[in-house]
Amino acid sequence: GKSTLLEALAVAHGFNPEGGTKNYVFSTHDTHSELCDAIRISKGYRKEKWGYFLRAESFYNVATQEEEYADFAHPSAKYHERSHGESFLTLAQNNLQPNGLYLFDEPEAALSPQRQLTLLIQIYRCAKEGAQFFIVTHSPILLGIPDADIYCFDNGSIHLCEYEETESYQVTEMFINNRQMLLDKLLTE
């Protein structure tokens, strides 16, 4: 699926399969797909100066590694002492830089709608300064990032689609605009 493809792109770019920067060398459970071996990365003239692979499912392990890699020059943000959403957003914000390459796998899993809006602002600003993002998301908030190319995975095909054509947008809009009718229909059948 989408997360497998994102992971393969991350590994092909040299990121740790569990997440982090290209400098992260750890493995708690090696389960990544061999798809990365079949991907050939074609790079353009610009080289990213920084990058990060952030995935909700292995965030705890990455936060632990962040603490282990901390030193005097790069103190720990003490992610385990914060709420899940606060630590996830802080880690993302601490690692976003212009001209970077970022791969985010379902970041909304850890974030409230308000924190998703905060992340949207950060992503938008970094993208305007040359950063490139690949984000797998079901969040209609994050799908709404201005000027984003949205790819939909439907019936075995991958294609560009408009924001309003995404299932996440359509289902959310339907629920918000017809909540009671939808609940009545779903819960009485």
Task: Report each predicted region and the residues it spans.
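Conserved nucleotide-sensing/catalytic segment adjacent to the nucleotide-binding pocket
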Residues: 23-83, 163-185
